[in-house]
Amino acid sequence: MAYQHCPFDTLLILDFETTSDAANQDYPCEVIQFAIVAYDVPNDKIREDISFNKYVKPVLNRTLTKNCVDFTGIPQRSIDTADTFDVVYEQFQQWLITLGLEEGKFAFVCDSRQDLWRIAQYQMKLSNIQMPAFFRQYINLYKIFTNEMDRMGPKELSATTNIGKMNEYYDLPTIGRAHDAMDDCLNIATILQRMINMGAKVTVNELLTCCASWRRQPLVYNKEWRSSFMDAGKIFERVLPLVVTTIRAGDFRLEMYGVCRYCRKGMDVCGTSHQQTPHDLYKNEEDPIHFAKIAGYY
């Protein structure tokens, strides 16, 4: 059943947790937990034995804010003894090699676009690591979920998070603690399994490309964006070089892997520099955009 609804043998459910300051969206968020759990599609099995879970030591702001500790549950001592992102990323790459997965034959699954488009892209810039091809096409499970609600019928949902809403819709119990990256991965994996078994077609539905036509238009935004996550998203869409492109279910093909859908160049070339630098935004902001400045975007 599961294999009929997904073209990949292996799905890697991924979640990041980051440093944060709730009162300031212009905060250079760094990864502090990096977790993955595998889902074996042909055998319809969540493979908790195939997992990756590491705490990561931030470099810019080494002391976690109270908001961050309360939100993630990650204690300062776990961060103090962890490796920095460049080391953990190398460990992750070695872990992938041990699994013997062939690029293009597996896909990452997240509960939104935030983990790979925003968090990974920004962290890679801070760590001077090129954004890998396997992070530039992924499955946004929540987007598939919204389509499934249209197909199966809506419900009144009281949850506020993507994971919470999906668990509530499918009557699934919450696993562990919200915003622990590994517990989030296990929740997403359980939701993924339920969705596939109920007939959802699960495949890559978002790509990261170097350009978008709408970014050529002047940006209209709230000048108080630093206090609003939603408003800050508009700023990130202009500052980050790679932008989300949605593709329809079934349109992703293996030959699309590793090639930017916009410029048609390989991902070892595309995205190494910003093709649509928001000069007007930088010029018009009275105060420097801190997260962009500290990462060297301008």
From Swiss-Prot:
SUPFAM superfamilies on file: Ribonuclease H-like
Cofactor binding comment, as recorded: Probably binds Mg(2+) in vivo, Mn(2+) ions are found in the crystal structure.
Keyword Cell cycle: no
Effect of residue 179 to A: Reduces DNase activity
Reported cofactor(s): Mg(2+)
Organism superkingdom: Eukaryota
Residues that, per the record, bind Zn(2+): 210, 260, 263, 270
Annotated control of activity: Exonuclease activity is inhibited in vitro by pontacyl violet 6R (PV6R), p-chloromercuriphenyl sulfonate (PCMPS), 5,5'-dithiobis(2-nitrobenzoic acid) (DTNB), aurintricarboxylic acid (ATA), 2-morpholin-4-ylethanesulfonate (MES), 4-[(4,6-dichloro-1,3,5-triazin-2-yl)amino]-2-(3-hydroxy-6-oxoxanthen-9-yl)benzoic acid (DR396) and fmoc-d-Cha-OH (FDCO). Interaction with ssRNA is reduced in vitro by PV6R.
Function text: Possesses 3'->5' exoribonuclease activity in digestion of DNA and RNA. Cleaves nucleic acid substrates with efficiencies in the following order: single-stranded RNA (ssRNA) > double-stranded DNA (dsDNA) > single-stranded DNA (ssDNA). Involved in apoptotic DNA degradation.
Protein name, entry field: 3'-5' exonuclease crn-4
Organism, scientific name: Caenorhabditis elegans
Designated gene of the protein: crn-4
